[in-house]
Amino acid sequence: MDVPGVNTTSANTTFSPGTSTLCVRDYKITQVLFPLLYTVLFFAGLITNSLAMRIFFQIRSKSNFIIFLKNTVISDLLMILTFPFKILSDAKLGAGPLRTLVCQVTSVTFYFTMYISISFLGLITIDRYLKTTRPFKTSSPSNLLGAKILSVVIWAFMFLISLPNMILTNRRPKDKDVTKCSFLKSEFGLVWHEIVNYICQVIFWINFLIVIVCYSLITKELYRSYVRTRGSAKVPKKKVNVKVFIIIAVFFICFVPFHFARIPYTLSQTRAVFDCSAENTLFYVKESTLWLTSLNACLDPFIYFFLCKSFRNSLTSMLRCSNSTSTSGTNKKKGQEGGEPSEETPM
């Protein structure tokens, strides 16, 4: 997989893959600006996702929706834990062994968790579509078991295709300042790197289509419902539309730009198909869009809040507990077990 932000052979130069052409690159932006941006994401994401994990693991896994959300929280938190290594490496604050660790472990983990999050977002979208068309259907034990098995399969599949990227990053750097991860990969490691890139592209575009198709159908269904009931003035149309566009906005902002830039950038790392100027441009585009994918870990908690009643009620209960311990037991029970007809909102 691509390696986030680790791309130099020395302070300001690199060699094009397969050639001995020296390519000068200005790293001031990646050494100063991006470490600051990732530091902001790290603290914001660590706080919000730790809180989200605490809340979700107080909620019983009584629906496919909750199961998928819990997996997303774990994935986001793992991604966030890779940020400090990237920050130190990009800012040139770590020694050579740290940069090798980034190439071999933490950058691979970053992409591993990214595509797990994308996969579960696709499953959540399908679940929301089914919930909209069949709002009163509850999850049976067999459905819950199927959701758990599917979750394990996703984690196992991504781990199996990611592990070789760690193992095949096994060349010793000739220079202590070498941080371009492609130089640390074996010949087959470069081939596998490219193969996994295309696999991940397929994963993304499948889930992209799922999000577009399902939410188009959801919007159509909600509009029909609105037309049927608009006389009663009970349908919060504007609120529902906001919920629809939260998912689409997050997907477009965080993931689409990076996946348009990823294939040409990977080719620039593994093949001599671009000149120096193009390689530098692709590098800056990749770094910028990669930061947007990292932003997803901070935006997902907002999705949990708007889509999941159990999460929203538990958060409200937790906030009330900070002001009044006398009502904590009642609020917690309401948040987790709820007397509402559904534990989550359809959208």
Curated annotation (Swiss-Prot):
<keyword id="KW-0297">G-protein coupled receptor</keyword>
<keyword id="KW-0325">Glycoprotein</keyword>
<feature type="glycosylation site" description="N-linked (GlcNAc...) asparagine">
    <location>
        <position position="7"/>
    </location>
</feature>
<feature type="topological domain" description="Extracellular">
    <location>
        <begin position="266"/>
        <end position="284"/>
    </location>
</feature>
<keyword id="KW-1133">Transmembrane helix</keyword>
<dbReference type="Pfam" id="PF00001">
    <property type="entry name" value="7tm_1"/>
</dbReference>
<feature type="binding site">
    <location>
        <position position="286"/>
    </location>
    <ligand>
        <name>ADP</name>
    </ligand>
</feature>
<feature type="transmembrane region" description="Helical; Name=7">
    <location>
        <begin position="285"/>
        <end position="304"/>
    </location>
</feature>
<feature type="disulfide bond">
    <location>
        <begin position="103"/>
        <end position="181"/>
    </location>
</feature>
<protein>
    <recommendedName>
        <fullName>P2Y purinoceptor 12</fullName>
    </recommendedName>
</protein>
<dbReference type="GO" id="GO:0001621">
    <property type="term" value="F:G protein-coupled ADP receptor activity"/>
</dbReference>
<dbReference type="GO" id="GO:0030168">
    <property type="term" value="P:platelet activation"/>
</dbReference>
<dbReference type="GO" id="GO:0007188">
    <property type="term" value="P:adenylate cyclase-modulating G protein-coupled receptor signaling pathway"/>
</dbReference>
<dbReference type="GO" id="GO:0070527">
    <property type="term" value="P:platelet aggregation"/>
</dbReference>
<dbReference type="GO" id="GO:0005886">
    <property type="term" value="C:plasma membrane"/>
</dbReference>
<feature type="region of interest" description="Disordered">
    <location>
        <begin position="321"/>
        <end position="347"/>
    </location>
</feature>
<feature type="binding site">
    <location>
        <position position="111"/>
    </location>
    <ligand>
        <name>ADP</name>
    </ligand>
</feature>
<feature type="binding site">
    <location>
        <position position="193"/>
    </location>
    <ligand>
        <name>ADP</name>
    </ligand>
</feature>
<feature type="modified residue" description="Phosphoserine">
    <location>
        <position position="61"/>
    </location>
</feature>
<feature type="modified residue" description="Phosphoserine">
    <location>
        <position position="63"/>
    </location>
</feature>
<comment type="similarity">
    <text>Belongs to the G-protein coupled receptor 1 family.</text>
</comment>
<dbReference type="InterPro" id="IPR017452">
    <property type="entry name" value="GPCR_Rhodpsn_7TM"/>
</dbReference>
<feature type="topological domain" description="Cytoplasmic">
    <location>
        <begin position="125"/>
        <end position="148"/>
    </location>
</feature>
<keyword id="KW-0356">Hemostasis</keyword>
<dbReference type="GO" id="GO:0150063">
    <property type="term" value="P:visual system development"/>
</dbReference>
<feature type="binding site">
    <location>
        <position position="269"/>
    </location>
    <ligand>
        <name>ADP</name>
    </ligand>
</feature>
<feature type="transmembrane region" description="Helical; Name=1">
    <location>
        <begin position="34"/>
        <end position="56"/>
    </location>
</feature>
<feature type="topological domain" description="Extracellular">
    <location>
        <begin position="89"/>
        <end position="103"/>
    </location>
</feature>
<dbReference type="GO" id="GO:1904139">
    <property type="term" value="P:regulation of microglial cell migration"/>
</dbReference>
<feature type="binding site">
    <location>
        <begin position="262"/>
        <end position="265"/>
    </location>
    <ligand>
        <name>ADP</name>
    </ligand>
</feature>
<dbReference type="GO" id="GO:0016020">
    <property type="term" value="C:membrane"/>
</dbReference>
<feature type="transmembrane region" description="Helical; Name=6">
    <location>
        <begin position="240"/>
        <end position="265"/>
    </location>
</feature>
<comment type="function">
    <text>Receptor for ADP and ATP coupled to G-proteins that inhibit the adenylyl cyclase second messenger system. Required for normal platelet aggregation and blood coagulation.</text>
</comment>
<dbReference type="InterPro" id="IPR000276">
    <property type="entry name" value="GPCR_Rhodpsn"/>
</dbReference>
<feature type="binding site">
    <location>
        <begin position="162"/>
        <end position="165"/>
    </location>
    <ligand>
        <name>ADP</name>
    </ligand>
</feature>
<keyword id="KW-1003">Cell membrane</keyword>
<feature type="binding site">
    <location>
        <position position="103"/>
    </location>
    <ligand>
        <name>ADP</name>
    </ligand>
</feature>
<keyword id="KW-0472">Membrane</keyword>
<feature type="topological domain" description="Cytoplasmic">
    <location>
        <begin position="214"/>
        <end position="239"/>
    </location>
</feature>
<feature type="glycosylation site" description="N-linked (GlcNAc...) asparagine">
    <location>
        <position position="12"/>
    </location>
</feature>
<keyword id="KW-0812">Transmembrane</keyword>
<dbReference type="GO" id="GO:0043270">
    <property type="term" value="P:positive regulation of monoatomic ion transport"/>
</dbReference>
